[in-house]
Amino acid sequence: MTKVTREEVEHIANLARLQISPEETEEMANTLESILDFAKQNDSADTEGVEPTYHVLDLQNVLREDKAIKGIPQELALKNAKETEDGQFKVPTIMNEEDL
């Protein structure tokens, strides 16, 4: 059985920005031990002659052909805009000069 210490659980909780009680820490340690023990079952699997795989499915970059298509006219694109300026959408400022 893999032993998970309270310190390890507290460290993981800290990394995850979680606040857990001492009772939860103990419970989490037991849960993590069970998970790690279950995962150790993979160590006993016979993988002799099994080719390593890097993806679950044997697919490679299934992409459509990149074709240029005609877009909509600028006037139609801007038709429902709340505000426009010089043929572009105008949006509220979210950063000031001092933020840069």
UniProtKB/Swiss-Prot annotation:
Q: What's its catalytic activity?
A: L-glutamyl-tRNA(Gln) + L-glutamine + ATP + H2O = L-glutaminyl-tRNA(Gln) + L-glutamate + ADP + phosphate + H(+); L-aspartyl-tRNA(Asn) + L-glutamine + ATP + H2O = L-asparaginyl-tRNA(Asn) + L-glutamate + ADP + phosphate + 2 H(+)
Q: Which Gene3D superfamilies match?
A: Glu-tRNAGln amidotransferase C subunit, N-terminal domain
Tell me the GO BP annotations in alphabetical order. glutaminyl-tRNAGln biosynthesis via transamidation; regulation of translational fidelity; translation
- State the UniProt keywords alphabetically: ATP-binding, Ligase, Nucleotide-binding, Protein biosynthesis
EC number assigned by the record: 6.3.5.-
Signal peptide range in chain numbering? none
Q: Supply the Pfam families for this chain.
A: GatC
User: Which InterPro entries does the UniProt record give?
Assistant: Asp/Glu-ADT_sf_sub_c (IPR036113), GatC (IPR003837)
Molecular-function annotations in GO: asparaginyl-tRNA synthase (glutamine-hydrolyzing) activity; ATP binding; glutaminyl-tRNA synthase (glutamine-hydrolyzing) activity
**Which SUPFAM superfamilies does the protein's record reference?**
Glu-tRNAGln amidotransferase C subunit
Q: Which domain of life is it from?
A: Bacteria
How does it associate, per the subunit comment? Heterotrimer of A, B and C subunits.
Entry-linked HAMAP family: GatC
What is the name of this protein? Aspartyl/glutamyl-tRNA(Asn/Gln) amidotransferase subunit C
According to its UniProt entry, this protein's organism is Staphylococcus aureus (strain Newman)
